[in-house]
From Swiss-Prot:
The record marks 206 as: Involved in acyl-ACP binding. The gene is fabI. Present in outer membrane vesicle formulations which are used as vaccines in human. GO terms for molecular function: enoyl-[acyl-carrier-protein] reductase (NADH) activity; identical protein binding. This is Enoyl-[acyl-carrier-protein] reductase [NADH] FabI. It comes from Neisseria meningitidis serogroup B (strain ATCC BAA-335 / MC58). CDD domains: ENR_SDR. The keyword Protease does not apply. The lineage of its organism: Bacteria, Pseudomonadati, Pseudomonadota, Betaproteobacteria, Neisseriales.
Length: 261
């Protein structure tokens, strides 16, 4: 029996089999969890439903996190199928493509800043607020996906780094707020992975190569490795952990200097 047997988990942000969210979903299902999913636009519904079916789920709901009405509707609909919620995965991030290349100050705009923060950062407390009644008193857990650009200046990551910094603050505040209700909240800072979302960052291939050459493991991490970490953080095995950011990056974040060898 898997360590997530009987757990009910809602996963956001799964848009392809290369998505980190897919790696998380697969790991959770392998450990016995029941899953539900969201999609953001109608053209993705069929694709997400197909992947959900492969993971033994028929629970797929539309949710544009820029809309409080859609967020609230997801949990209203989910409540018709489940009596509660044990896990929530926030795998959501977006910034206009033109803001993810070149000079930071030249690329940033008020509109790009607001969009990146609304979708990538505000969406975590917005989802947690709506999920709270279903998660309360169940030893439940929230996991959100971040990146090293939250705390380091990564070329071309630009405004998304600011949004991820805000997300990580949101993880800590959410953990502090919900702990007394038996709800934990943690983050995973994953190393760069070639996903559809990552393709919007300029020179991403160079970033992948640099990280693989300079982290202690001398390779990039996989969605399976991130998925296994998320499954642990969503389980009772991690019951004493909340408000933390766990790095799954092959050790790249420990480096003071990037040297060959």
């Amino acid at each position: 029996m898997g360590f997530l047997q009987g757990k009910k988990i809602l996963i956001t942000g799964m848009i392809s089999e290369r998505s980190i969210a897919y790696g998380i979903a697969k790991a959770c299902r392998e450990q016995g969890a029941e899953l539900a999913f969201t999609y953001v636009v109608d053209k993705l519904e069929e694709r997400v439903r197909k992947m959900a079916a492969e993971l033994d789920s028929e629970l797929v709901f539309r949710c544009d996190v820029a809309s409080d009405d859609e967020i609230n509707q997801v949990f209203a609909d989910l409540g018709k199928h489940w009596d509660g919620l044990d896990g929530l995965v926030h795998s959501i991030g977006f910034a206009p493509k033109e803001a993810l290349s070149g000079d930071f100050l030249d690329s940033i705009s008020r509109e790009a800043f607001n969009t990146a923060h609304e979708i990538s950062a505000y969406s975590l407390p917005a989802l947690a607020k709506a999920a709270r009644p279903m998660m309360r008193g169940r030893n439940s857990a929230i996991v959100a996906l971040s990146y090293l650009g939250a705390v380091r200046a990564i070329p071309n990551y630009n405004v998304m780094g600011m949004a991820k910094a805000s997300l990580e603050a949101g993880i800590r505040f959410t953990a502090a707020c919900l702990g007394k209700e038996g709800i934990r909240c943690n983050g995973i800072s994953a190393g760069p992975i070639k996903t559809l979302a990552a393709s919007g960052i300029a020179d991403f291939g160079k970033l992948l190569g640099h990280v693989a050459a300079h982290n202690p493991l001398r390779r990039n991490v996989t969605i399976e490795e991130v998925g296994n970490t998320a499954a642990f953080l969503l389980s009772d095995l991690s019951s004493g952990i909340t408000g933390e950011i766990t790095y799954v990056d092959g050790g790249y974040s420990i480096n003071a200097l990037s040297t060959e060898g």
